[in-house]
From Swiss-Prot:
It is found in: Cytoplasm. This is Ribosomal protein L11 methyltransferase. It catalyses: L-lysyl-[protein] + 3 S-adenosyl-L-methionine = N(6),N(6),N(6)-trimethyl-L-lysyl-[protein] + 3 S-adenosyl-L-homocysteine + 3 H(+). GO terms for biological process: methylation. GO terms for cellular component: cytosol. Pfam families: PrmA. CDD domains: AdoMet_MTases (cd02440). InterPro entries: Ribosomal_L11_MeTrfase_PrmA, Ribosomal_PrmA_MeTrfase, SAM-dependent_MTases_sf.
Length: 299
């Protein structure tokens, strides 16, 4: 059965009113989109920005009275008129549609990320079989790829790891397959913790090798490697905590950061971490370094 989309173009200032009106007028879902190709990569702390030209898209059932719904949306938003368009959305198996576009990715020599529904291109390689589910982390995003590429070049034999903001578990599972002895995962999203556990099982790894926790329950024992692919704001705030999770000489890998945010990250971590490399892919970067030796009380 097809669906109907009502698309209303508006300004940043009016967008919340139109969004509220759409939600109160029987829409099954409401989405806000950029209407002028002005990307917002990450809001500043405490902000929830919108695009100056914003498109509000409401999803309605196919038998919707379009005239009546438009009038109701305008009335509830307090507008006399609005630039709008009704669009027919053909019904599809969206999960299958998405699956056709997700292909194996090589992240290093002999190291592949493969969707669980495809055969690995190189059966003899280290193949991480992944079903992302509802959490982030498929290997396609530049930040995930940069972290995986770094892991592929490290000696992980018998290393202990924390995957902070584990999402689908892709980084931690990659570390285990590349030789790490154990990974501790943490995330604020329960769906992410579930996806991680499912992907651990999918890769035939023992559940005890990758326990997962909410951040307030995560063990604080220092480890050899900390991976954190989240956002710049949280990474800056978490600098003392993430540094404290590293043994002296332990390795840190940070991503989820735009090149324009590099200086803020470096300033936050340089007191405790010797920054070694900054990798870049498109506009995103990955920062790696080594935990400095702890200062003695006499120092």
């Amino acid at each position: 059965m097809p669906w109907l989309q009502l698309r209303i173009n508006t300004t940043r200032e009016l967008a919340p009113r139109v969004e509220y009106a759409m939600a109160k007028s029987g829409s099954l879902a409401v989405t806000l989109q950029d209407n002028a190709d002005h990307p917002i990569f990450e809001p500043a702390l405490g902000e929830t920005p919108l695009w100056q030209e914003t498109r509000i898209v409401g999803l309605f059932e196919a038998d919707t009275d379009t005239t009546a719904i438009l009038e109701l949306v305008l009335k509830k938003s307090g507008l006399s008129e609005a630039q709008h368009q009704w669009h027919i959305l053909e019904d599809k198996d969206w999960e299958r549609e998405w699956m056709t576009h997700y292909q194996p990715i090589q992240c290093g020599p002999g190291f592949w990320i493969c969707p669980s529904w495809t055969a690995p291109p190189d059966p003899q390689a280290v193949n991480l079989m992944l079903d992302p589910g509802l959490a982030f982390g498929t290997g396609t995003h530049p930040t995930t790829f940069l972290c995986l590429q770094w892991l592929a070049g490290e000696n992980l034999a018998n290393k202990t790891v924390i995957d902070y903001g584990c999402g689908s578990g892709i980084l931690g599972i990659g570390a285990l397959l590349l030789g790490a002895v154990s990974v501790t995962g943490t995330d604020i999203d329960p769906q992410a913790l579930m996806a991680t556990q499912e992907n651990v099982k999918r890769n035939n790894l023992p559940a005890e090798s990758f326990p997962v926790y909410f951040p307030d329950k995560c063990p604080e024992n220092p480890v050899d490697i900390v991976l954190a692919n989240i956002l710049a704001g949280p990474l800056v705030e978490l600098a003392p905590a993430l540094s404290a999770l590293l043994k002296p000489g332990g390795r840190l890998c940070l991503s989820g950061v735009l090149e324009t945010q590099k200086d803020d990250l470096l300033a936050a971590y340089e007191p405790t971490v010797e920054i070694e490399q900054v990798f870049q892919r498109e506009e995103w970067i990955c920062i790696t370094g080594t935990r400095r030796a702890l200062k003695s009380a006499k120092e």
